[in-house]
Amino acid sequence: MSDKTMKDIQAEVDRYIGQFKEGYFSPLAMMARLTEELGELAREVNHRYGEKPKKATEDDKSMEEEIGDVLFVLVCLANSLDISLEEAHDRVMHKFNTRDKDRWTRKEEGK
């Protein structure tokens, strides 16, 4: 297991996609793929934590694998649109730390 930054992950995915003539799919096609992968993750969550058990004939996929699939497609989408996920993360955390700073009940420090 390595400590990869989001920048490292984006570069690794870009190198992988870059070896194929087809390159990145269109943003619309990647949104369809992302929706598909999110559906597969939702199915796993539902089977593990919901009321709907798997059929005996269904493969047992891991949550880690499904989250990895979602991450891969999200990175592809960001790369194709030239979006730094580190910068996007920083912006959203700033938003949460300012807009939502008093929205939730904070834990007492030291607990």
Swiss-Prot record:
Database matches in CDD domains: NTP-PPase_BsYpjD (cd11531)
Name the record gives this protein: Uncharacterized protein YpjD
Disulphide bond pairs: none
Classification via Gene3D superfamilies: MazG-like (1.10.287.1080)
Pfam families (alphabetical): MazG
InterPro entries assigned: MazG-like_dom (IPR004518), MazG-related_YpjD (IPR012359), YpjD/YvdC (IPR047046)
Record note on quaternary structure: Homodimer, or homotetramer.
